[in-house]
A protein has these predicted regions:
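Residues forming the flavin
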Residues: 1-11, 31-215
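Acidic/polar low-complexity interaction segments
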Residues: 13-16
Length: 215
């Protein structure tokens, strides 16, 4: 993301640490992978540029359990409604129109936070246009999911877990990068409102690991 364009680096790192402490409180791992100058140097020998950062591997399965505990804790203090679509937001009155299986209902809120994700991007874009809020498009990357035998990435997975590597193509100067690495994970198809995409999952449970890694 581009959060550091709006906040100082130190503030962003502080928020990341706060978020991590919350996740750990609800069962997330405390293990951190440290940067490796050795692997960075190996990449540079082939004109590959690897980002350096502390990383954690939560795991799809382990993260699901962490989220369940977090939601149960939140439910003791706030109301959580699922299976409900927000179909309208009045900017002046702060009244939301929510559609459920029983029909539409109005909900008034002091403050409203839009967190629409990919599935709600069209709704949010239309709402911004209706309320004369200017929009601009971010860069869109064209991606493929690559799967290789896990032994190819074994050194990286054991030392830093997730390599984030960039390469500038010689022909056209395009930036090619890898991200969302899954050590001995699974490649899956996801359907978001009829749009099919390919994603990867990695698990902490050894029994669910495969012989391949993907990114």
């Amino acid at each position: 993301g581009w959060l550091t364009e709006f906040l100082p680096d130190e503030t962003v790192l502080d928020y990341i640490e706060q978020a991590d402490q919350i996740l750990v409180k609800f069962g997330a791992t405390t293990e951190r992978f440290q940067p490796s100058n050795e692997l960075k140097k190996r990449c540079l020998e082939y004109d590959l540029h690897m980002s350096q950062a502390q990383l954690k591997h939560l795991g799809t399965d382990s993260n699901f359990e962490t989220m369940k505990k977090l939601i149960h804790a939140l439910a003791e203090r706030v109301e959580i409604h699922t299976g409900a679509d927000v179909v309208g937001v009045d900017r002046e009155s702060h009244i939301l129109t929510v559609k459920t299986a029983e029909g539409e209902q109005a909900v008034e809120a002091g403050k409203i936070i839009f967190a629409v994700g990919r599935a709600g991007s069209r709704f949010f874009s239309a709402w911004c246009e209706e309320n004369d809020i200017p929009l601009h498009n971010n860069q869109v990357d064209v991606g493929v999911r690559v799967e290789l035998p896990s032994m190819v990435w074994e050194d990286f997975a054991k030392k830093i877990y997730e390599p984030k590597i960039r390469y500038r193509s010689k022909g056209y100067g395009d930036i090619i990068r890898m991200f969302c690495f899954n050590d001995r994970g699974q490649v899956v198809t996801e359907n978001t409102n009829g749009v099919l995409t390919v994603n990867g999952h990695a698990y902490r449970d050894e029994a669910r690991k495969t012989q391949n890694s993907n990114f």
